């Protein structure tokens, strides 16, 4: 999609495809961890990852 198409339709690709996810804890749209349908921003994921069962190896 080119810039002219975005200007003509007035929407971004994420809105067209229905991918309007946001962080479940803080509502942030950027830096999302969407794997396994987690949908937490990376900052929130770091805070709760251990409680969710993820292990840090380094």
Curated annotation (Swiss-Prot):
Alphabetically ordered keywords of this record: Metal-binding, Ribonucleoprotein, Ribosomal protein, RNA-binding, rRNA-binding, Zinc
Please verify whether the record's keywords include Methyltransferase: no
Please indicate if the UniProt record lists S-adenosyl-L-methionine as a keyword.
no
**GO molecular-function term, one example from the UniProt record:** rRNA binding
Q: Which residues lie within the region annotated Disordered?
A: 1-21
Q: Which Gene3D superfamilies match?
A: 30s Ribosomal Protein S14, Chain N (4.10.830.10)
What cofactors are annotated for this protein?
Answer: Zn(2+)
- Give the UniProt record's GO annotations in the biological process aspect: cytoplasmic translation
Q: Provide the binding site for Zn(2+).
A: 23, 26, 41, 44
Per UniProt, subunit arrangement is: Part of the 30S ribosomal subunit.
Q: Which PANTHER family does this entry report, sorted A to Z?
A: 40S RIBOSOMAL PROTEIN S29
NCBIfam families per record: PRK05766.1
What is the official name of this protein in its record?
Answer: Small ribosomal subunit protein uS14
- Taxonomic source organism: Haloquadratum walsbyi (strain DSM 16790 / HBSQ001)
The gene coding this protein? rps14
């Amino acid at each position: 999609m080119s810039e002219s198409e975005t200007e003509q339709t007035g929407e971004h690709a994420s809105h067209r495809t229905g991918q309007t996810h946001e962080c479940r804890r803080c509502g942030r749209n950027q830096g999302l961890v969407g794997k396994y349908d987690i949908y937490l921003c990376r900052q929130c994921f770091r805070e709760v990852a251990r409680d969710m069962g993820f292990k840090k190896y380094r």
